[in-house]
Amino acid sequence: MIFDPTFRRLGLGASLAVAAALVAPAHAEITIGAIYSITGPAAALGTGPRNAMALWPKEIGGEPVRIIVMDDASDPSQATRHARKLVEENKVDVIIGSTVTPGALAISEVAIETGTPQLAASPVELAPEKEGWTFRLPQSIALMAEGTIEHMHRQGVKTLGFLGYSDAYGESWLRELKKNADRVGITMVAAERFGRADTSVTAQVLRLLATRPDAVLIVASGSGSAMPQLTVKERGYTGKIYQTFSAVAPELIRLAGKQAEGTYGLSGPAVAPDQLPTDHPSRQPALEYIAQYEAANGKGSYNQFAANIQGGLLVLQEAIPVALKSAAPGTPEFRRALRDALRTVGEVAVPQGVLDYTATNPYGFDHRARFVLQVQDGVWRAVD
């Protein structure tokens, strides 16, 4: 693996891997580029994926793999520059990233322009004419918003307040929430926004709580989900609080403490695989991956953002051998063959659900990729 030296020093293992690759030239080396938010406001989302890449095998489909990991510093303009460098200079066969929606959106422009498959590590939404080269590793916002509203409806929620990011991720959630809320008779009584780098949401929370909603949905991610959670609780709110799948992780509980108790969130199977039915297709892949990841990074280090990247590995292990039958890596023909293979390999059980990409479904997941959790006694637990 190569971590771009501009951003990350090579570890000894990585250095040896690179040296070995130089001594023994590859017959058909596959180059995988990854762009994550390892620093900046969204760094909590990029650390797990970076660590996940370090566990990837040195070969896929019998061919050597070169991995280049770059840090976009939570900046979409950096993501664009890195994507162009990966395609034009490094001749990558696929780009993974970014871990935040604005960055993934920026990379998607390069992907479609250059005909390079992208495995987005955030649930970026694209206009129909921009689809074609971008596949998503997390669940779609549409899938998770639908499940969230359905749970609220079962809980008797009639009015909902929205408190979320003022970017593409937040707006996508707001749009899907409104659509699903209208369907079941839940009224959106407030929609307040804040920036990812904001340090206070007091004014927004005061306006939101003045509408007395039955439930509040916080649309934030990683460590950024704790500050609005604390503000809502500190202002005396006693209704139901929901977080999105980008916040359902130990990080929220660590930062919000007891103020996280009772919070609901929909997430993928990888968050609590031991609580899945024994016949769930993701139970075993997730349990095995947690053991592998924590053996390398320490107990309690695992999160669903790393699991998304493991899903990328598993689907590439199915698609790359198919693409190799018709083209050589490092060529436009191989990139197209890989794109086509991703669309046709069929169901692949991954830690977050069952991926089944098609030409018309670049999200891949179905209802098996979501379940409801609640913070109980400092732990995310599955609930009805």
Could you tell me what each predicted segment is?
Residues 22-28:
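Sec/Tat signal peptide C-region and signal peptidase I cleavage site
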